[in-house]
């Protein structure tokens, strides 16, 4: 089995010099979300941390789409990773682990597709803010102390989004449904591959989670 991996790589946005600042700013904004919105006030502090650590990638992707972020990935050295002499079930599991941690050309194409679809919808700033809150409030997480509070907050955000669509886009009753259809793709993009692509050169030997911990304490 042969898998095309990018290995060590860096992101380029045409040499405009603003890429790192944007990525850092979006991560900082994501951390500040937990204190910004009153609807989140009923959620346990530890649960808010858990939610942020699991969803920061989704929040940044939505910032990318909102700001028409374009990028190219330039691998330092393309690598063909081969797993010979492994039985097929083990080989599939090994490849799956590789693909979730190491960026591949498939990952890059997948992310560009997701961002492109969101951009095509011409989502406004209010919608993006509410979508980020929905992504933050992941009701499927199992290690929450008070999942009911998260569910209630998520339902409130969903209602606010529905009301907003009714008032601002009355002629497009399917707009909300179309937006929500794109969220599983945002959620499903591998977080380790995303961190490797966009943040490894910024955080160095630490992790994005560690950076978020520091941001929450400041």
What are the functions of these language-model segments?
Residues 1-218:
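Nuclear receptor C-terminal ligand-binding domain
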């Amino acid at each position: 089995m042969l898998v095309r991996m990018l290995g060590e790589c860096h992101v380029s946005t045409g040499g405009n010099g603003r890429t790192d600042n944007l990525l850092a700013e979006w991560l900082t904004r994501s951390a500040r979300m937990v204190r910004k919105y009153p609807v989140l006030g009923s959620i346990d502090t530890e649960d808010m941390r858990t939610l942020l650590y699991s969803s920061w990638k989704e929040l940044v992707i939505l910032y990318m789409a909102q700001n028409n972020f374009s990028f190219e990935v330039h691998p330092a050295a393309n690598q063909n990773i081969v797993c010979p002499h492994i039985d097929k079930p083990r080989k599939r599991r090994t490849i799956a682990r590789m693909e979730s941690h190491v960026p591949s050309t498939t990952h890059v194409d997948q992310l560009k597709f997701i961002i492109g679809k969101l951009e095509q919808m011409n989502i406004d700033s209010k919608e993006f803010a509410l979508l980020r809150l929905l992504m933050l409030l992941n009701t499927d997480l199992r290690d929450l102390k008070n999942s009911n509070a998260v569910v209630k907050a998520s339902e409130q955000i969903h209602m606010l989004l529905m009301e907003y669509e009714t008032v601002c886009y009355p002629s497009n009753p399917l707009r909300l449904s179309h937006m929500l259809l794109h969220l599983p793709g945002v959620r499903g993009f591998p977080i380790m591959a995303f961190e490797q692509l966009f943040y490894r050169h910024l955080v160095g030997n630490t992790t994005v989670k560690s950076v978020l911990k520091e941001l929450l304490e400041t």
